[in-house]
Amino acid sequence: MKIPFVSFEKMHDEIKDELTGKFQQVLAKNWFIQGEELAKFEEEYAAYCGVKYCVGVGNGLDALFLPLKAYGIGTGDEVIVPSNTFIATALAVSYTGATPVFVEPTLESFDIDPAGIEEKITDKTKAIMAVHLYGQPAPMDEIMEIAKCHNLKVIEDSAQAHGALYKGKHVGSLGDGAGFSFYPGKNLGALGDAGAFVTNDKELADKVRALGNYGSDYKYHHIYQGNNSRLDEMQAAFLRIKLKNLDRWNANRIETAEKYLAGIRNPEIALPTIMPDTKHVFHIFAIRCARRDELEKFLNEKGIGTNKHYPIPMHLQGAYENLGIKKGELPLAEEISATELSIPMYYGMTEEETGYVIDAINAFK
């Protein structure tokens, strides 16, 4: 049996006619940027997240970079970032001219450790990037309390957590604002690159919108030195269709995760933990194994697709060697990078496929 790491086939088969019909509608209108589909998606996604404002942007990186820029964060400033994350979280900080300050996760949640945040705050610190890694909400109460005490902004990196809940509230509604990626592989994915920023702060939303539209507040009137980062009509239209199905698709992922959690019984494997008062949406089902590379080879030989998220922590990436952080300085992030393995997780996995993965992992010795 061959089981891919990720597959969109069943998801897209279910909505193929809707996607095709919407494509024809947008094509017929001959309006492809900043039109009706974008306005409707922004309204619908803001309502879904439980916030007042949504600004469509070109990708998930811009959804993090633009609010930092809007806050005036730049050269000489520092922003707290977990070291075990996708590099976009750190690049968003770097693009402003500020310095990312890397912090350890906890092995239990994979998310940033609030105690580590406190240790890294200086008089240069301006914000915290709260990443909901793999679909597991970060400990937002603690993070927001720290931010309040030190007068810091909190931007949620919700790129992997569409639909996740923290104490009954959607991620994206908990900090000062949040960036989402709609990269095709996400729980809510476009058919190309796309992203959005959400917030309850009108002034912030307006500035992010202007910065992503060449710094313009209206046509040919430019109040900032901005960028070109806009969610186009076609992707917005596709995302509107997918948003209607997101909760159902997430429920299916959670069912698959529950089967994994109940069925994997190998003493060499550490399973993910669902933290209290959260709804984990399992963008990634991340296991850990001291013999990770051997396990990966074993599973791949059985036709099971895998991935690593992420094999090199941010502080050891060549892009950040200028920070001078040595191997061993952030040991928990390094341990996760050395032991984490992501196994198949996508909408529509069958009982047979899930069982095959479970049996293969349990057979690893």
For every predicted segment, state its role.
Residues 69-158, 165, 364:
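PLP-dependent aminotransferase-like
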Residues 156-191, 218-223:
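Conserved active-site segment immediately N-terminal to the catalytic lysine
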Residues 31-78, 92-96, 102-104, 169:
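Phosphate-binding glycine-rich loop
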Residues 1-5:
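Extreme N-terminal starter segment of soluble prokaryotic enzymes
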Residues 180-181, 195-200, 240:
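Short beta-strand-to-turn element immediately C-terminal to the catalytic PLP-Schiff-base lysine
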Residues 9, 21, 36-43, 48-54, ...:
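PLP-dependent aminotransferase class I/II
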